[in-house]
Amino acid sequence: MNFRSLSLIVLCHGIVAAAFAFVFLLEAFEIAFPLLSLEAQHPNFVATEYSKVACLFVAVAIGTFSAYEIFFFPSYLNKLSDEATRKKIKMIFVSYHIPWSLMITYIALLDGTTWNAWISVAVMYGFTLWGAIAKS
């Protein structure tokens, strides 16, 4: 198993993203998942009708994208022989993690946030770095 394989990185990212989508889905129904839910990471979080709809939206968005990363992109990347396209996919993967990483860091630095908010930060920066060192 090549740990610098872009297809493996995308697959692992899709699996982790699916887990986060599940956490947000639970959050939409006011079920707090230990360590990862908004309520667990931000004790001052108050569920409202709007926040539940926003969590549902996030769950569907992340879940949809994770399905592509699990069921399509790994096999597509393994069959892809065009080096320029592979490099472009790698660049996009790394690039879209940068604003996400900054946003997650900002959220973890908010007053009242618990230590476990840094789990999401570590995951986000980890995938950014792993994607950056991937072989394209």
Roles of regions detected by a PLM:
Residues 101-119:
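Membrane-helix boundary connector in multi-pass membrane proteins
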Residues 16-54:
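Hydrophobic transmembrane helix segments
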Residues 2-15, 86-89:
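Interfacial segments of alpha-helical transmembrane regions
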Residues 125-136:
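Membrane-water interface at the C-terminal end of transmembrane alpha helices
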Residues 43-47, 80-91:
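Juxtamembrane helix-capping/reentrant segments at transmembrane boundaries
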Residues 69-86, 108-109:
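Juxtamembrane helix-break-helix junctions at the cytosolic face
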Residues 18, 49-76, 92-96:
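Core segments of alpha-helical transmembrane spans in multipass integral membrane proteins
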Residues 68, 86-105, 123-127:
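Hydrophobic alpha-helical membrane segments
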